[in-house]
């Protein structure tokens, strides 16, 4: 039986909002991630699962990227990456990003479970850990947190 989750993204003092869905058809199988985010500037925006499902002080309460394996930041296809590193979403000229990702590192159960954690869309492009400085190995230089939401169990 498939496991499903959903995240409603809301702007942290920004007009950014969206709905992102997650589905994992088998326990150790890939997770499909899809949905739409609006209110963005045109171009790439970092897209990560952060450690905590805490938005009490806005998106900053979510903590760092979800990284249970204590690795350096990377891209979604890299061996060396945080579990929560989902790369970038691309917004069109109207500020809308259509999201369609399949990821085999995140999970909806077990040690890499993202349910109850916060999904964040960032101000800038994620350099995927290749920016040549220390911040790149932690955050991908993706900048401030534009919008976030806690990932919850869905029907």
Curated annotation (Swiss-Prot):
PTM N6-succinyllysine: list the residues: 4, 10, 93, 124, 138
Q: Which residues carry this modification: N6-acetyllysine?
A: 124, 138
Q: How is the cofactor bound?
A: Binds 1 copper ion per subunit.
Q: Which residues bind Zn(2+)?
A: 65, 73, 82, 85
The cofactors required by this protein are:
Cu cation; Zn(2+)
The family database entries (InterPro entries) matched by this protein are listed as: SOD-like_Cu/Zn_dom_sf, SOD_Cu/Zn_/chaperone, SOD_Cu/Zn_BS, SOD_Cu_Zn_dom
Lipidation (S-palmitoyl cysteine) occurs at: 7
Keywords, sorted A to Z: Acetylation, Antioxidant, Copper, Cytoplasm, Disulfide bond, Lipoprotein, Metal-binding, Nucleus, Oxidoreductase, Palmitate, Phosphoprotein, Zinc
Q: Where found in the cell?
A: Cytoplasm; Nucleus
State the Gene Ontology BP annotations: auditory receptor cell stereocilium organization; embryo implantation; glutathione metabolic process; heart contraction; hydrogen peroxide biosynthetic process; intracellular iron ion homeostasis; locomotory behavior; muscle cell cellular homeostasis
The molecular function terms in GO held by this entry are: copper ion binding; protein phosphatase 2B binding; protein-folding chaperone binding; superoxide dismutase activity; zinc ion binding
Q: Which PANTHER family match?
A: SUPEROXIDE DISMUTASE CU-ZN -RELATED (PTHR10003)
Q: Describe the protein's quaternary organization and the partners it interacts with.
A: Homodimer; non-disulfide-linked. Heterodimer with SOD1. The heterodimer CCS:SOD1 interacts with SLC31A1; this heterotrimer is Cu(1+)-mediated and its maintenance is regulated through SOD1 activation.
- Identification of the protein by name: Superoxide dismutase [Cu-Zn]
Q: Which organism is it from?
A: Pongo pygmaeus (Bornean orangutan)
